[in-house]
């Protein structure tokens, strides 16, 4: 894929997110720009620019296809669009087989976890960052016996969380 795809995606994203602001009150387009700068390759950059377009704007996948976005990019975008009826960590696990979706979601989670971007950090922000840390652990790889290591926690594929002491296991449902 050449640079035309990522440039097209950037143009679509800038137009689609015009007037939107993030939690810190800054132009929302700065978020996809940061995510795009954090991934390698034109296809990944195109996905990064567009990763929130279908969820957060009136544009549809059909609109993107009509504007020239490739099937490869649209496939990754469909995976990245979270169906709220699917538990969050199950949705995150579904991204792992697609390298574009996985790379963009990791960059997205890392940027969204950066609480230093916010003027004031609330308890809700801290809970969201903890949720994202678990998602990053899922995407970064699976350890032995179904465990995924991440930031002092061990997240099991079956949806349980434990620190290094098995008696402290808790349901991940409280983090969804």
Question: Which sequence ranges carry the predicted segments?
Answer:
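Active-site helical microenvironments for divalent-metal-assisted chemistry
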Residues: 1-176
